[in-house]
A protein has these predicted regions:
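Short, Φ-rich (hydrophobic/aromatic) sequence segments
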Residues: 24-38, 109-113, 117-120, 124-125, ...
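Alpha-helical scaffold segments that mediate packing/assembly in large oligomeric complexes
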Residues: 92-171, 290-291, 297-298
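Protruding loop/beta-arch "assembly-hinge" segments enriched in small, turn-prone residues
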Residues: 1-27, 36-38, 45, 261-298
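Flexible loop/turn segments at secondary-structure boundaries
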Residues: 63-65, 184-189, 279-282
């Protein structure tokens, strides 16, 4: 018996309204997501071999506490390799398109929707893994900083940037990256020592010589910075990306200009729900620190 495979060049969207993207389509999306996601740029990738949960191994330093699964933390008294359970959770996004899309081949529809899918996923991954916003994960970079009491409250200036780094140095952590946002650059340029030398190099986008990556997210407030050892941030992706097309119902998370929810049938639109499983985990408990302008953002 011949197994029928999904050929996106020949199958119309109306003929296949749910299923999984082909491996090639998933690879294309994940390549673009990885190039834009801060978690994926700075974190350490682990192959999950198609498993929802996978044991990976982490080298400890004999001083710090380490998360070995989502709820259990251990502390070792000497450097050793410990098993860590990396568990994937589902992240979903919803996008809308004209009902005309039902007449497209899946290949054309995929090419049209790919930029939106990529942007939505890398934003979702970063907000969950870095900020802990609407996250299925047990920990995040920001939560790690808060739980370790490694938060500096105050404006971006030379003194506070040094205090931020000192939080990590006191824990014997060498930061290898900062996460900032473009709106912070003017404050960073004005962060100068007594000799009027700036700690920020705009030509290389580095703070105190350390790589700085800008996060584009409304959830990451102006004046906030994250820093730490991003080798302690690990992630994995076990499966292909899944999709489901809907033609009826309301999209409560999306609004028309008048504030009413989008009604797919009445407005002749379709919605595509795209889901992926991804694991994101902070392994070293005190690996990160945060600078925030407001105590409300701690």
């Amino acid at each position: 018996m011949t197994v029928q495979t999904f050929n996106p060049d020949k199958v119309l969207v109306s003929e296949k309204k749910d299923g999984s993207f082909t491996k090639q389509m998933t690879d294309i999306i994940m390549k673009d997501v990885a190039e834009n996601s801060v978690v994926m740029q700075l974190g350490q990738y682990h192959e999950m071999d198609g498993l929802q949960e996978k044991t990976v191994y982490v080298q400890t330093d004999g001083v710090s506490a380490y998360w070995v699964n989502e709820t259990e933390k251990i502390k070792t008294d000497k450097p050793e390799v410990v098993p860590v359970s990396l568990k994937a959770h589902k992240l979903g996004i919803i996008l809308v398109a004209s009902r005309e899309a039902l007449n497209y081949t899946w290949q054309k529809f995929f090419e049209d929707m790919k930029p939106q899918i990529v942007e939505a996923f890398h934003t979702k991954i970063d907000e969950a893994g870095l900020l802990g916003h609407e996250t299925p994960f047990a920990n995040s970079v920001a939560k790690s900083a808060k739980d370790s009491s490694q938060v500096v409250v105050g404006p971006i200036n030379y003194e506070n940037l040094l205090k931020l780094e000192d939080k990590l140095y006191e824990a014997d952590i060498n930061p290898n990256a900062f996460v900032s946002k473009i709106q912070n650059r003017s404050a960073l340029r004005e962060s100068r020592d007594g000799d009027k030398k700036t700690i920020y190099d705009k030509a290389t986008n580095t703070i105190d010589g350390i790589t700085t990556v800008d996060l584009k997210s409304k959830q990451f407030k102006k004046g906030d910075l994250l820093t730490g050892d991003f080798n302690s941030l690990i992630y994995g992706v076990p499966y292909n990306i899944n999709f489901k097309i809907s033609e009826e119902g309301q999209i409560s998370t999306m609004k028309n200009s008048d504030g009413t929810p989008i009604n797919l049938f009445e407005q002749e639109m379709v919605a595509i729900r795209v889901t992926m499983d991804i694991a994101v985990m902070v392994t070293k408990a005190n690996a990160f620190a945060k600078l925030t302008a407001s105590a409300e953002n701690v």
